[in-house]
């Protein structure tokens, strides 16, 4: 194989490529690099040059040298005695010289020997050739050196240019960094100044608040002092009234001896009893009165009488209270008690009796109330309520809720008047709160709902406005959830609600229409008005909101905008150019045509509506979508319609309540608050609310719990009443229609909108023969309890965009529970429809196969009566059915037992042949009868 390149030829010759290149250059073959290709002519030229330079050109070689090399190994022990292997190389060299066989005669040699002049001429020519070769080599070396020097200079220039460019780049980078540093320092200074200003404002505000708080505390203290002074004055007046002497008319009696009076008086003073004084002592006191000089006697008598009157009041029957109502039997009646304060303690007891006088209260009892709240309403301690309930045989704690009946019984037992509290009206309560706040009404962004038929380009239109790719991410390319977004435009913020267009999502579209200010009705210019377009128009007109029509796909060649306008006019949606009030805009979601004009029309409608809402108020709004997330709990997408929703607010949404733990915007980012017309996701509700429920922010969590409990109870009672009515209706319907097959289903979906849409679509599949029964439908993943319910009800579990957990899958596999997963509502409806079709009883259809005429009748002892027949049309087969006609009247219908021809059993006999036919369990046949043969075929039915 010949070598193709210089490098390969050099390897073959065992030379370096550089040496071979030099030799080729000397031979006049111009090759620059080792990868250049050599041909046979180049090799021949090199060979001729080498032979000429070594003097062997044109002559035979006289001497040849051969070198032989062989290698062998020997083993020899070293000084340590270890054997080592030594390689021995033997080289042999032999030289062979070729000798001439014929030696010419000396005369011939002499004649053939060249002359000295010829030799000199040859030598000079050789010398000239050698000089020319040397000069040529020197010129080539000079040219090569010159090229190398130029290449080296070029590389040096490029290196210098790169170094200069790098230095300039570094200088520019340093200048930019210094500018950025200066800008950052400037921004930091501005920020520090703003922070200092904010701190100063905060300090000033705090000082003002502290001053206001101090003034309020001072006013409160003054008010408290005034109330305390009034209470003390009232108590002093009561005490003075109680201590005032009575006017008593006493008749004169004969005087008694003074010692007796003295003894009576001293005895009275010593005893200090609470009982009335004896008659004798009283007489003595009255007798001693005249002996006293002037008014002194009257004063003593009045004091004694008032003292006895005061003691008498302590013996009156009193109502038991928690105060000391023993009439003076207290610590002062114990031995060793303080003696000097006895009179003061009695005054304190009288004051306490007046202060703790029992008052009958009117206690309003709500649906549920805790023990502590009930005690607070009756102004007593909770332990008294617990004691009363224990007497009634009910063990409770202080925080345990009581029902309304039990609480009213306790109130009556405690001596108060119990009244049923009015039912909580959350809307009125919220309206009362908002009106009490007197919040300022500010302009808000419009809420725009995009509605229309499926695949008319609603989501694609929003994608172009939002510059996102939502439509491609939806399963099946259709929207199955309500999407809420807010978009910032040069003229303000617009909030969009994207509703599904599929017929199953009617409830979602209705919710979107109720929560909106403006409706964008999307209608494809190449498709026209469709059923869901008409439904969207009805929802918008029912909600009373203006309609802006967007004619999508207007850039397609088959678009016919005028035809679509005429169809919409037929649905009472009249464009402005026809004298109506609905602007029509032709748009394209691909090219962006008409998008700006559409937004302009929407904002113009918003300006006409003058949308306003309070900002500094408790938030109110509507729940758009709900779901149950495994890691976050119940999640609700809400649209704030008024007020500001903040993290930490107590939210009441339908039958659920809770404190907002976190808020996320439509991009999944955390946010602290959301104003009017802003959609957010909130977490923290105790359960998953119903989509479409109104939500509101309450100040009191207890109030929110009461309202949610009341709503749940009301909903439960309504649901039970509906179920009972449905059971009665079903019972009467089943009695009238007979046995009806049911297909029990359990539906679990990711969001509530999809769950209710799927349930409604599946219930529509029910027929008179088979009925779809929704055993349970909910939001969240498929749990073990769902599988257990499916086992008990023999239901099929349908998961829409959800999956079963490990325990649920294990339980389902062990009990053969069918769990099916879907992410497109079409597929779920189609498969359930197919399953219902399989449950339908097949349709039996009769198909005629032939006729025969009985020409003779045979009677055999072992077989029975046999009809000798002639097949007039079609054929007769074994085990087919027949119909016996006599005088064109059907006599009997049965089965053919066997068919014989020429004493042989055959499967079938065709037209034009005779055969014997044995009829099963029937022998009453005559000549001339007609037989019709037919088969019953079962055909599968579909819904």
UniProtKB/Swiss-Prot annotation:
Its main location: cytoplasm. Residues 477-481 are annotated as: G2. It is found in: Cytoplasm. One of its GO terms (molecular function) is translation initiation factor activity. Residues 498-501 are annotated as: G3. Keywords: Cytoplasm, GTP-binding, Initiation factor, Nucleotide-binding, Protein biosynthesis. The keyword Transit peptide does not apply. One of the essential components for the initiation of protein synthesis. Protects formylmethionyl-tRNA from spontaneous hydrolysis and promotes its binding to the 30S ribosomal subunits. Also involved in the hydrolysis of GTP during the formation of the 70S ribosomal complex. Belongs to the TRAFAC class translation factor GTPase superfamily. Classic translation factor GTPase family. IF-2 subfamily. This is Translation initiation factor IF-2. It comes from Acidovorax sp. (strain JS42). The gene is infB.
């Amino acid at each position: 194989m010949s070598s193709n390149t210089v490098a390969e030829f050099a390897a073959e010759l065992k030379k370096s490529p550089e040496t071979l290149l030099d030799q080729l250059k000397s031979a006049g073959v111009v090759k620059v690099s080792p990868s250049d290709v050599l041909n046979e002519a180049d090799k021949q030229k090199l060979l001729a040059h080498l032979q000429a330079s070594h003097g062997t050109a044109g002559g035979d070689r006289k001497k040849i040298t051969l070198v032989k090399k062989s290698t062998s190994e020997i083993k020899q022990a070293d000084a340590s005695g270890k054997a080592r292997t030594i390689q021995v190389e033997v080289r042999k060299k032999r030289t062979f010289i070729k000798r001439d066989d014929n030696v010419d005669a000396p005369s011939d040699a002499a004649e053939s020997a060249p002359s000295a002049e010829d030799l000199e001429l040859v030598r000079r020519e050789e010398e000239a050739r050698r000089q020319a070769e040397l000069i040529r080599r020197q010129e080539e070396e000079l040219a090569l050196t010159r090229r190398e020097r130029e290449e080296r200079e070029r590389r040096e220039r490029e290196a210098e240019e790169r170094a200069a460019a790098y230095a300039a780049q570094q200088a520019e980078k340093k200048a930019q960094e210094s500018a950025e540093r200066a800008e950052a320092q400037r921004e930091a200074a501005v920020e520090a100044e703003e922070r200092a200003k904010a701190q100063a404002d905060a300090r000033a505000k705090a000082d003002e608040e502290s001053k206001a708080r101090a003034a309020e505390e001072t006013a409160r203290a003054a008010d408290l002092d005034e109330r305390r002074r009034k209470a003390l004055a009232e108590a002093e007046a009561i005490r003075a009234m109680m201590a005032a002497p009575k006017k008593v008319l006493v008749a004169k009696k004969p005087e008694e001896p003074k010692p007796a009076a003295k003894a009576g008086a001293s005895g009275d003073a010593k005893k200090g009893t609470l009982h009335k004084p004896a008659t004798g002592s009283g007489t003595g006191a009255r007798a001693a009165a005249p002996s006293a000089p002037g008014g002194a006697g009257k004063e003593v008598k009045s004091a004694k009488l008032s003292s006895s009157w005061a003691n008498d009041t302590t013996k009156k029957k009193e109502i038991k209270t928690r105060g000391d109502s023993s009439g003076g039997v207290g610590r002062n009646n114990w031995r060793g008690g303080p003696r000097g304060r006895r009179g003061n303690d009695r005054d304190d007891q009288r004051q306490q009796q007046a202060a703790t006088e029992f008052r009958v209260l009117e206690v309003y009892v709500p649906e549920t109330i805790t023990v502590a709240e009930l005690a607070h309403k009756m102004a007593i301690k909770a332990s008294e309520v617990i004691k009363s309930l224990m007497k009634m045989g009910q063990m409770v704690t202080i925080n345990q809720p009581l029902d309304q009946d039990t609480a009213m019984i306790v109130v009556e037992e405690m001596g108060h008047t119990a009244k049923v509290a009015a039912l909580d009206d959350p809307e009125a309560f919220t309206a009362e709160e908002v009106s009490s706040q007197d919040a300022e009404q500010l302009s808000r962004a419009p809420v725009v709902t995009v509605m229309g038929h499926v695949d008319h380009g609603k989501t694609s239109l929003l994608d172009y406005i939002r510059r996102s790719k939502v439509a491609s991410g939806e399963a099946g390319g259709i929207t199955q959830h309500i999407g809420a977004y807010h978009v910032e435009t040069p003229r303000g913020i617009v909030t969009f609600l994207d509703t599904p267009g599929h017929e199953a999502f009617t409830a979602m579209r209705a919710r979107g229409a109720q929560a909106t200010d403006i409706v964008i009705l999307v209608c494809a210019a190449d498709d026209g008005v469709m059923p869901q377009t008409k439904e969207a128009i009805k929802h918008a007109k029912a909600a009373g909101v203006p309609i802006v029509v967007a004619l999508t796909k207007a850039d397609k060649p088959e678009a016919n905008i005028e035809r679509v306008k005429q169809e919409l006019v037929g649905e009472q949606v009249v464009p402005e150019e026809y004298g109506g009030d609905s602007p029509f805009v032709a748009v394209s979601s691909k090219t962006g045509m008409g998008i700006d004009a559409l937004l302009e029309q929407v904002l113009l409608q918003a300006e006409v509506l003058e949308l306003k809402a309070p900002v500094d108020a408790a938030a109110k709004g509507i729940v758009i979508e709900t779901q149950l997330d495994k890691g976050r709990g119940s999640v609700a997408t809400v649209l704030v319609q008024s007020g500001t929703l903040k993290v930490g607010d107590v939210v009441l949404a339908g039958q659920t309540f809770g404190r907002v733990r976190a808020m996320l915007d439509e991009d999944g980012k955390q946010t602290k608050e959301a104003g009017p017309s802003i959609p957010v996701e909130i977490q923290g509700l105790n359960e998953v609310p119903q989509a479409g429920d109104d939500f509101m922010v309450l100040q009191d969590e207890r109030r929110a719990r009461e309202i949610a409990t009341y709503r749940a109870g009301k909903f439960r009672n309504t649901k039970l009443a509906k179920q009972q009515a449905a059971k009665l209706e079903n019972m009467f319907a089943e009695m009238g229609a007979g046995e009806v097959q049911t297909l029990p289903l359990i539906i679990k979906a990711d969001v509530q909108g999809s769950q209710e849409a799927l349930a409604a679509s599946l219930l529509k599949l029910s027929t008179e023969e088979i009925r779809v029964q929704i055993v349970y439908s909910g939001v969240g993943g498929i749990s073990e309890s769902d599988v257990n319910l499916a086992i008990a009800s023999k239901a099929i579990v349908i998961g829409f965009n959800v999956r079963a957990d490990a325990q649920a899958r294990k339980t389902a596999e062990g009990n053969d529970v069918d769990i099916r997963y879907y992410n497109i509502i079409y597929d779920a409806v189609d498969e359930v429809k197919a399953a219902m079709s399989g449950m339908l009883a097949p349709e039996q259809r009769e198909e005629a196969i032939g006729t025969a005429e009985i020409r003779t009748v045979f009677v055999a002892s072992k077989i029975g009566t046999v009809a000798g027949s002639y097949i007039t049309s079609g054929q007769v087969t074994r085990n087919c059915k027949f119909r016996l006609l006599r005088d064109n009247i059907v006599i009997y219908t049965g089965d053919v037992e066997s068919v014989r021809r020429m004493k042989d059993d055959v499967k079938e006999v065709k037209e034009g042949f005779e055969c014997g036919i044995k009829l099963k369990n029937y022998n009453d046949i005559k000549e001339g009868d007609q037989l019709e043969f037919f088969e019953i075929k079962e055909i599968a039915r579909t819904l």
